[in-house]
Swiss-Prot record:
Record-given protein name: Cytochrome b
Membrane topology: Multi-pass membrane protein
Cofactor requirements of the protein: heme b
Assigned keywords, A-Z: Electron transport, Heme, Iron, Membrane, Metal-binding, Mitochondrion, Mitochondrion inner membrane, Respiratory chain, Transmembrane, Transmembrane helix, Transport, Ubiquinone
PANTHER family the UniProt entry points to: CYTOCHROME B (PTHR19271:SF16)
Summary of subunit composition and partner proteins: The cytochrome bc1 complex contains 11 subunits: 3 respiratory subunits (MT-CYB, CYC1 and UQCRFS1), 2 core proteins (UQCRC1 and UQCRC2) and 6 low-molecular weight proteins (UQCRH/QCR6, UQCRB/QCR7, UQCRQ/QCR8, UQCR10/QCR9, UQCR11/QCR10 and a cleavage product of UQCRFS1). This cytochrome bc1 complex then forms a dimer.
Compartments (UniProt record): Mitochondrion inner membrane
Record-level Gene Ontology MF annotations: metal ion binding; ubiquinol-cytochrome-c reductase activity
Species in which this protein is naturally found: Cynopterus sphinx
């Protein structure tokens, strides 16, 4: 008799995705981040669900309801901080996951890569709307600044912004709809994750060498289940250290001041994981130009398969491309730092140079260096 996990319609799906899935024998810990992102999503959905039971999406009571969760709800404080810092862990894993894909040429699997970009946009939208919900100063002004960017769209811009606001400013209607969408989007993300995995399992995983590994596969369980469990343990430990020892390390103190439309904070800035994009937005003096640069800073990832000029897939054996890649990482860290600084000299010029370098590296330098490497290898 066939094992139930191989014959039962539902168990067969799980078996083919998590147990008997053939995986390359040489994938490193950089391949752990997919499962870590799944765990992050699960943590966020569960903590978010319990927070939603006590939260009220009304401008008069939203801030107070978050205080109530932290003070009066049993273990409400840990739920709130797990959710807030869980988002940070989510983005750390996301950036490392995307970075891995860039380094090892995983973007050659175009469908998987494009669904991944959609996922990145969806997670960013969810995180932005979630940041508005506590209704602190940074929530309110962050929402005002970012939604206002849409007014840069010619002709329909102003109408579009007022339609999203549900009025003439960020107010009760905006908060209510943001809560509704913040609740809805993680389930859309979950559906996209299934599509992402579906496309991945069509082709099989890439590996550090970038060479097809069809002739050398091992079952996912027990080899990679145990490896993923180690990664999960390290990530959960890091999250708990953050939550239990310095829960406000990555937050903004201004968000402990209730939202006040009559008082603008001295420095409006988003959460740390958006700072690189915020720096690119600010480095262009023109509003529409800034918005386009902001969108393109993420959308440029969709061009990666077209910009791949190397005869090799992975950067493992390409030292010059590795230099370009790490220069890109350093540039993104610089942009993240600049995004958190006030708009004054010398930060303005540093931000502008870092923004130019970002697009220059991806669109010009990396493809050129790949061509040079091909010639060096006489290909």
């Amino acid at each position: 008799m066939t094992n139930i996990r191989k014959s039962h319609a539902l168990f067969k799906l799980i078996n083919d995705a998590l147990i008997d899935l053939p995986a390359p024998s040489n994938i490193s810990s950089w391949w752990n981040f997919g499962s870590l992102l799944g765990i992050c999503l699960l943590i966020q959905i569960l903590t978010g669900l319990f927070l939603a039971m006590h939260y009220t999406s009304d401008t008069a009571t939203a801030f107070q309801s978050v205080t109530h969760i932290c003070r009066d709800v049993n273990y409400g404080w840990i739920l709130r901080y797990l959710h807030a810092n869980g988002a940070s862990m989510f983005f750390i894993c996301l950036f490392l996951h995307v970075g891995r894909g860039l380094y090892y040429g995983s973007y050659i699997y175009t469908e998987t890569w494009n669904v991944g970009i959609l996922l990145l946009f969806a997670v960013m939208a969810t995180a932005f709307m979630g940041y508005v919900l506590p209704w602190g100063q940074m929530s309110f002004w962050g929402a005002t600044v970012i939604t206002n960017l849409l007014s840069a769209i010619p002709y329909i811009g102003t109408n579009l912004v007022e339609w999203i606001w549900g009025g003439f400013s960020v107010d009760k209607a905006t908060l209510t709809r943001f809560f509704a969408f913040h609740f809805l989007l993680p389930f859309i993300i979950s559906a996209l994750v299934v599509v992402h995995l579906l496309f991945l399992h069509e082709t099989g995983s890439n590996n550090p060498t970038g060479i097809p590994s069809d002739m050398d596969m091992i079952p996912f369980h027990p080899y990679y289940t145990i490896k993923d469990m180690l990664g999960a343990l390290i990530m959960i430990l890091a999250l708990l250290l953050l939550v239990l020892f310095s829960p406000d390390l990555l937050g903004d103190p201004d968000n402990y001041i209730p939202a006040n439309p009559l008082n603008t904070p001295p420095h409006i800035k988003p959460e740390w994981y958006f700072l690189f994009a915020y720096a690119i937005l600010r480095s262009i003096p023109n509003k529409l130009g800034g918005v386009l640069a902001l969108v393109l800073s993420i959308l440029i990832l969709a061009l990666m398969p077209l910009l791949h000029t190397s005869k090799q897939r992975s950067m493992m054996f390409r030292p010059l491309s590795q230099c370009m890649f790490w220069l890109l990482v350093a540039d993104l860290l610089t942009l993240t730092w600049i995004g958190g600084q006030p708009v004054e000299h010398p930060f303005i010029i540093i931000g502008q140079l870092a923004s130019i370098l970002y697009f220059l590296l991806i669109l010009v330098l990396m493809p050129l260096v790949s061509i040079v490497e091909n010639h060096l290898l006489k290909w």
